[in-house]
Amino acid sequence: MDHRLLEIIACPVCNGKLWYNQEKQELICKLDNLAFPLRDGIPVLLENEARSLTSDESKS
């Protein structure tokens, strides 16, 4: 994931900052507790493609 891209893109739901989870290949919005997948290195920033974070994931 290109870190320059992370400086530009935002959560499509709240326009908040996204955090990269390299292990799970996801972009995380901590404000909405959503995880957006990366497919072939490309962020899929569609609300209906996001998964809700578990309570344990939200705390970290």
Swiss-Prot record:
The organism's place on the tree of life at top rank: Bacteria
Pfam families noted in UniProt: Trm112p
One cellular component term from this protein's GO annotations in UniProt: cytosol
Entry similarity comment: Belongs to the UPF0434 family.
Protein name: UPF0434 protein YcaR
Organism from which the protein derives: Salmonella arizonae (strain ATCC BAA-731 / CDC346-86 / RSK2980)
Gene (name only): ycaR
